[in-house]
């Protein structure tokens, strides 16, 4: 079993099972091991005054197939090398293989969820749309991880630059 991640808000179906599978495991879609911070490390980086802030050491992601949910916490420091490493934490083939272990004759629900810097994205669909679901999950993960705090801060605090440019041109 995996360690519980403090502040984890990824939804699990009622009575859902949590599997670790380990890297290269026969069932898990993940190809990297769980990198959850230790309790001491988590306490050092967690801001108790802002309960909506995530641990800045990485992000949480999960794949769910029916009642079975696989979760990972991966370290991510915002560098290009780190981005390429975490983008390879699972592939379409590893997801298809893991999901096929739980498919029967009926369609089951499949869900991908990622939480990074207070933003949570969940994509879900049926097992018949798994290929499309994994493609959307890859795009969402890449876009979410490439948003840096500087980009978010500049858009919010400085207003929309295209509006300022338009005003300058019209004067």
From Swiss-Prot:
**UniProt key word Protein biosynthesis:** no
Output the superkingdom of the source species.
Viruses
Ranges annotated as biased composition (Basic and acidic residues): 1-15
Is the keyword Acetylation in the record? no
Q: Which InterPro entries match?
A: Tombusvirus_p19 (IPR004905), VP19_sf (IPR036131)
- Keywords noted in UniProt: Host-virus interaction, Inhibition of host innate immune response by virus, RNA-binding, Suppressor of RNA silencing, Viral immunoevasion
Which GO MF terms are attached to this record?
A: RNA binding
Give a single Pfam family match. Answer: Tombus_P19
Q: Which Gene3D superfamilies match?
A: RNA silencing suppressor P19
GO cellular component assignments: virion component
Q: Which family does it belong to?
A: Belongs to the tombusvirus protein p19 family.
What is its biological role? Viral suppressor of RNA silencing which binds specifically to silencing RNAs (siRNAs). Acts as a molecular caliper to specifically select siRNAs based on the length of the duplex region of the RNA.
This chain belongs to which protein, by name? Answer: RNA silencing suppressor p19
């Amino acid at each position: 079993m995996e360690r519980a991640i403090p502040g984890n808000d990824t939804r699990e179906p009622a009575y859902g099972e949590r599997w670790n599978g380990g890297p290269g495991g026969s069932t898990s879609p993940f190809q990297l091991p769980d990198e959850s911070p230790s309790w001491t490390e988590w306490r050092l980086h967690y801001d108790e005054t802002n309960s909506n802030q995530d641990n800045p050491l990485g992000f949480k992601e999960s794949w769910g197939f029916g009642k079975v949910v696989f979760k990972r916490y991966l370290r991510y420091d915002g560098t290009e090398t780190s981005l390429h490493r975490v983008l390879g934490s699972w592939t379409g083939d590893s997801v298809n293989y893991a999901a096929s272990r739980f498919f029967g004759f009926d369609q089951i629900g499949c869900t991908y969820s990622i939480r990074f810097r207070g933003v949570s994205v969940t994509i879900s669909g049926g097992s018949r749309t798994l290929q499309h679901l994994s493609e959307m999950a890859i795009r969402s993960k890449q876009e979410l991880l490439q948003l840096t705090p500087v980009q978010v801060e500049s858009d919010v605090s400085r207003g929309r630059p295209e509006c300022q440019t338009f005003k300058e041109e019209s004067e």
